[in-house]
Amino acid sequence: MAMIDLTHDWQLLAQNPAGGLNSSSLLLLVGVFLALFFAAVLGFFFLRYGKLWFQAFMSDADVQLLNLIRMHFTKVNPNVIVQAKVMVAQAGLNIGRRDGISTHRLEAHYLAGGNVMNVIHAIIAAHRAQIPLEFDQAAAIDLAGRDVLDAVQTSVYPKVIDCPDPKRSGKTTLSAITKNGVELRVRTRVTVRTNIEQLIGGATEDTVIARVGEAIISSIGSAETHFKVLENPDMITRVVLSRGLDAQTAFEIVSIDIADIDVGENIGARLQNDQAEADTRVARAQAERRRAEAIAAEQQMNARVSENRSRLVLAEADVPRALAEAFKAGRIGNVSSVAAAEGSA
């Protein structure tokens, strides 16, 4: 009926262009144009997103066509949101608009730069494994830069960390020395699973490796002999596990296993040998010093003997001169007569 009236108005306008249209006909014409415009817009969006909407409708994913239109203007990928909602709905999770994984919450996480599909996969895996994981918690972990799906998988299937890790430190064994001075080279494997509650702000694998290595070295160092460690390696692991090394970390230590123990050098014997060699060198140095002092004293005595000999030679050289002077002075004859007189008396 409206189309007939519109056609009639156009005919009147054509017959009487100067008279124009009345106000009611003009409003009707504008209304028809607006209706056609909105119908064209809706048709455009329906042709573009109708398949996604039908997929969501058939999957009971609670995604409306208006939501898809809003995503078009907010630069949100509707394929990702619809696929995520379908997966959540098929997994039997709560998709309620109030407290469930709603379309609005998925859009907000997408606009924040998060990985929506990774979060949904993690939540579904946690739900299957009966691990408590809410959407807000998973989204926060994802936005913090952690791989939430890998964290859930590690919680379900614990992974093994080598201590030390050759990829990080370049070393294959830990070196520790018992009290008797024998070096032990140990290779350890630490089984851990993710502690989702501590995943944000918790220490990483490097901290766990460092703590375990420090505890193992300390435990071996407190052993009296290396034989006790070789006989009972479990003694070390029990001590290490009792220290609570996984505190404030993103992991929970399941077990610590000694994979290999090798006996290295006898550090104590080597140190004793080095000390003995040092003492020998000191004794040799002292003996050499005493020998040098003795040689110096001998040379000094020889110098004194030579000096005394020279004095003796000088004294012997003065004897003939003294005798000659005595003959000249007649002291030798007087001395002889006096001696003869004393003899006769």
UniProtKB/Swiss-Prot annotation:
Its main location: membrane. This is Flotillin-like protein FloA 1. The lineage of its organism: Bacteria, Pseudomonadati, Planctomycetota, Planctomycetia, Pirellulales. One of its GO terms (cellular component) is membrane raft. Disulfide bonds: none annotated. InterPro entries: FloA. Coiled coil: none annotated. The chain crosses the membrane at residues 26-46. The keyword Membrane applies. It is a single-pass membrane protein. Keywords: Cell membrane, Membrane, Transmembrane, Transmembrane helix. It is found in: Cell membrane; Membrane raft. It comes from Rhodopirellula baltica (strain DSM 10527 / NCIMB 13988 / SH1). Belongs to the flotillin-like FloA family. Homooligomerizes. NCBIfam families: PRK13665.1. It comes from the Bacteria. Found in functional membrane microdomains (FMM) that may be equivalent to eukaryotic membrane rafts. FMMs are highly dynamic and increase in number as cells age. Flotillins are thought to be important factors in membrane fluidity.
